Every structure is written in structure tokens, then in C-alpha cells.
Amino acid sequence: GYFDAHRAELDELYTKIVKNLNQQAQVMGFHDYSELSYVRMNRIGYGPEDIKRFRDQVAHDVVPELQKVIALKNRRTGIQHPTFADLPVAFKDGNPKPIEGYDARMSAARTMYHELSPETAEFIDFMQDNELFDVESRPGKMSGGYMTSLPSYKAPFIFANWNNTSADVDVLTHECGHAFEGYVAERDPKIPADLECPGMESAEIHSMAMEFLTAPWHHLLFGKDTDKYEIGRA
């Protein structure tokens, strides 16, 4: 494939990037880019040694289990010698796709959050009634997804670039987790303004939790592909 044919070129390019990043860090007084990154990413309460212990634990406990999951997927897809390019392939007959159409998905999301709790019902009504989603794809639109805030309006805003894959639902529920946290925090007078947005050490708790809390409503967004989606996430 392409990557094998350009392995040497890509290795050289990667080496140049690493050297350049280290040089940038040294200009700013750091030993290397790794040391700078702890500051740049707002790491608090832990350092390189803690990360090493965590990394070793992942290698010891998580990797063997992940290898079992990947082996099951390979038997399901029939791919005998997978490369990293095959990682997204979950089923021989195609990956699960969500229901089509912005209006249909937004309607499903409103139903989902109304059934989840009164608080999330209020949240999703505010988001949709005030058009605080920019998630449809269009020419020239940047890739990725994120949640940001419009403080003057106490309004979260969600940006994404749907591409008619299961990732559309992932980004919807994930960013709604961030947005719901922001919506609640901005309305709580006990929370100072500079703490309304959590640090990077805790922000993903809200987003990942929302992905799991909305699992009972997968059928609203996937229809006949619900089982495939849930198997793929197992």
C-alpha cells in the first residue's frame, strides 16, 4: 500500500518533525517538547513518572484485552493480515450507519434527552431552539468536532462535520456531554466564572459519560444497525 511504499520518506519526515518540536521547546527554555507539553496541555497534579506508570499499566492490563477484541473483529470481517488501515472496518458487509437527515437526527436527539432526564430535556430544547448546532458538512468546512461557549448568552455551541458514519452519533453525544456541563455550570451561581469550564483533567469525564448514558437510545439513531453499532463499541 501507499504507506509501505513511502515508509522511508514518512520516517524521515517524522524524525524532522520531532527534532523541530524539540528545538522549539529548547528555545523557550525547556529540555524537550515532552517537558513543554505538560505546561501546554495544562497538566496538573502529575508528571512524567506518573504517566510512565500509567503507560506500563495500560501495556500490561489493557493491551492484551484489546488484542482479544481485535482478533474477534478480524474473524468477523475475514481480514487475515490486518494493517492499521483496516482498524475502522468492523463488519464484512459494512459498518453501521446512523439514520439519515439532520432533522431526523435532531428529532431523535430531542426525544433521547427528554427521556433521559428533565435537566437534559431543558438543555436540548435550549440548544435546538437557539440553533446552537453546526454539524452538517459543507464545502470548505474544517474537519473535527468540538464544543465551545458563548458566555454572554450562557450558551454552549457544538461544531462538527457529519459524514454519514457512526462517528456522527459519537460526536453528537460526546460534545453534548461537554455542552451539558457548560449549560449547567453557567447557570449555577455557586460556580465562579473561571471554573465553569473544567480543566483538561476532568472535561472528558462529562463527554464520555454522556456517550454511555445515552446508550439505551441507540435505536433511535441507528434503527436496523443498532446491534452492529453496539457490537462495534463493545
Question: Could you tell me what each predicted segment is?
Answer:
Residues 1-233:
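Cation-handling catalytic/transport regions enriched in His/Asp/Glu
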